[in-house]
């Protein structure tokens, strides 16, 4: 079984435990004895609390109790120094049923029709490509199919590409590439590269296709959807449909207990006062956002096209955006932005 981007933190331990227990249940049902966590077991790069470390310890003990071996690859959130071979997962590398990946390793069993090469995270604009080349030179041979499991950003996975992302062509020696890091499932067109999705939803910006990838001995694989964790759903509604029927639907989802719902109500600015935001919240919406169909960009963000943005200015603009959109958890975005060097963007 492959799973990634579990992101345990002091604020989500019950969700993490439910996530892992579901994974263990699937392993028991299907007699799976090997689990690979492909990066970002942890959320905070700065430090881990005792509660977090004990929850991970209990997770690994529960796997051992069911005779399941766990391979942990370090993700970018699992390291303080992104180029280091060792991260937080290495705290657990002496557990008898645990292997922690330093740089890369290969998993292969006599009954498998493939070899699974697992790599820890290294910066896309740093040493990753060199390390991948070394893996390909050392481990690839003609006989089994060669699968790769990594935790990286690859060009073509997101709607807006980044210069920092890796080019897809460097993965051509591999028959199949499974990837963590970006949380939504997607296949890069024209390649064998597939983002398998995080093990559960973390916020409203992610879709509901989250869970686990089961690799069979013949090299085929199956996505198994997470059923136990909270779902984050965004409902876009015109103002005329934001009445009793919508409230009944919200009450049903609240009674189900598995959904947090953000309602985005679209209406002309003049009609916004007719939307009963309080009633929608009372009916079970976690958030209600009013979107004016004819709204203009706020003055605060309509800066000159030629304005220079350094890292401080970008962070301030991001925080303003989150306040405007009522986004509570800004820490992950700020963590990514903190890597931007303190220099102007543009020409």
Spans of features found by a protein language model:
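Conserved beta-strand elements of the Class I
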Residues: 1, 115-117, 213, 231
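A conserved active-site cap/scaffold subdomain adjacent to cofactor or substrate pockets
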Residues: 180-239
